[in-house]
Each structure stands twice: as structure tokens, then as C-alpha cells.
Amino acid sequence: MKKKLILGLVMMMALFSLAACGGGGNVVKTDSGDVTQDELYDAMKDKYGSEFVQQLTFEKILGDKYKVSDEDVDKKFKEYKSQYGDQFSAVLAQSGLTEKSFKSQLKYNLLVQKATEANADTSDKALKEYYKTWQPDITVSHILVADENKAKEVEQKLKDGAKFADLAKEYSTDTATKENGGQLAPFGSGKMDPAFEKAAYALKNKGDISAPVKTQYGYHIIQMDKPATKTTFDKDKKAVKEAYLASQLTTENMQKTLKKEYKDANVKVEDKDLKDAFKDFDGSASKDSSK
């Protein structure tokens, strides 16, 4: 959850709720003068209007072509909740978000993802090329600690015969996984921190344990629970396609998709103050830069 994205969502909700209210009433009164709804709306529109009208417009465009169910949103929401563990409610509160408003943002993100996937090349030729470097999902457990000395202490306890799950519960700072013995959800290549992923895939057999691995989060000790098993393209095709589509969800591809969807939707901006809101999508930005 990027802070900018979260704060932006809060601002957007405030901005357009004011627009719906209208009436020009006061939002603040002082002896020196009042701040009206119109003044606040105009100020927020000037600063944030283009960004938010983009999202609202694309919600309409994409929502008309692609379907995201409540179940889809709930599934993604639970993934975030699991990722942040006990800190999830605090993160939402600190960002001024409720579960409802965060789910609204998740729905938009999923619409963009579905549109991008629908525009991806999923021919056998493309999938077979991807299959050359594809690796199946693996399942591992980890113990995360803050410093190298603590990691070496845990490593020694493992060598002395202590159970991995017991040490995860005792030492791991990952609150989302420690009570489950440190086990993470299955993941494939490109999904985790590169150093963590490299060390995890280097473990070939069930029960293999890594040396301490440093990442931006601290030091990890990783245990292989379910190693990768690559068979043939035909047998692996479903999993390959899922991983391939996930790999296509880059900023560049999403931007290309939004440009295509914008062009197909016959968009007309009727508010002169927001006439440049879609310059990155209608080609006017490149025209301006060439002048």
C-alpha cells in the first residue's frame, strides 16, 4: 500500500463528495473570513482534479468491459491483510482509510489488471518462449530477524536440532507468518525480494535450510517445504499462463492498455479546467513536447 496512493484516495473521496453536495456553504468560519465549500472544491480540483478524474473515468470505461466481483476484491483484500498481519488495521487508520474505501481502490487496480491481461499476447509461441525461463511455484517457511547476530544464533539452534516452526514462533518478527511456523504462501519467480527468491530456489529438497539471507526487511533463514517440479509445457501450461500474465502487469503495459481503452471509449472532457487531464492518453502530451 503506497502512501501516495492511499492519501490520494482519501483526497478523491473528499473532493467528489463536496462536488455532490454543492450549495456553496461554509466548511470553516473565522472572524477573519469563512472558507466555503466552493473555495475548498476549487482548490482541491486545481491540485488533484486531473489525477482523480482519470481514475473515475477509467473506472467507468473498464467497468463496462471487464468484471471484477466482490469475491475478487475480498480475496485481494485478504492477501493484503495477511501480508501486514497485526499491523494492517494500524496502517489503514494512519492513512485515513476504512476497509470499505481501501476495497474501492483495490477494485480499480483489479480492473486495470484485467484489462492489461486481456490485451496481452497469450499465444502458444509467447507462452513457450516464457516457459524457457519459467520456474514453478515453491512453498517455503522463513524466520525473519532484525540483525545478523540474531540470525546466526537461530541458525546455530537449528544445527543443534531445534525445530524450524518452533524457532519461527519464538524469534520471527514477521507477525503474519510466525504463528504458522513461518510458512509463506506459494510463490513463483519474480514475486519476492530478489535475494530471498534466489536463496529459496537454491534449496532443492524438502527440509533444506538456507544460511542467513539479507534483504531490505532484515535477515531471513529459509526452509524448503515444497520444491519446484517442472514437467512439460503441455502439463504446466495453465500455471505458465498465470505466471506469464502476472509478468505482463508492468507499469508500461498498463499504460499502453489504458491508452488503447481511452481511444476506444470516445472520451470528451467537457470541463475546461480539466482539459489536460488525459494528455498522457490522447497523444497531446507528445505533441506539446515536439513544439
Swiss-Prot record:
A Gene Ontology BP annotation from the UniProt entry: protein folding
Domain of life: Bacteria
Domain (PpiC) ranges: 135-226
Lipidation (S-diacylglycerol cysteine): C21
Example GO molecular function: peptidyl-prolyl cis-trans isomerase activity
Compartment(s) where it occurs, according to its Swiss-Prot or TrEMBL record: Cell membrane
Catalytic activity reported: [protein]-peptidylproline (omega=180) = [protein]-peptidylproline (omega=0)
Keyword Lipoprotein: yes
InterPro entries on file: Foldase_PrsA, PPIase_dom_sf, PPIase_PpiC, PrsA_foldase, Trigger_fact/SurA_dom_sf
One cellular component (GO) term of this entry: plasma membrane
Primary location recorded for the protein, binned into one broad class: membrane
Signal sequence bounds: 1-20
Membrane recorded as keyword: yes
Lipidation (N-palmitoyl cysteine): C21
Keyword field: Cell membrane, Isomerase, Lipoprotein, Membrane, Palmitate, Rotamase, Signal
EC number: 5.2.1.8
Annotated family: Belongs to the PrsA family.
PANTHER family: FOLDASE PROTEIN PRSA, PEPTIDYLPROLYL ISOMERASE
Function: Plays a major role in protein secretion by helping the post-translocational extracellular folding of several secreted proteins.
Name under which the protein is recorded: Foldase protein PrsA 2
Encoding gene per record: prsA2
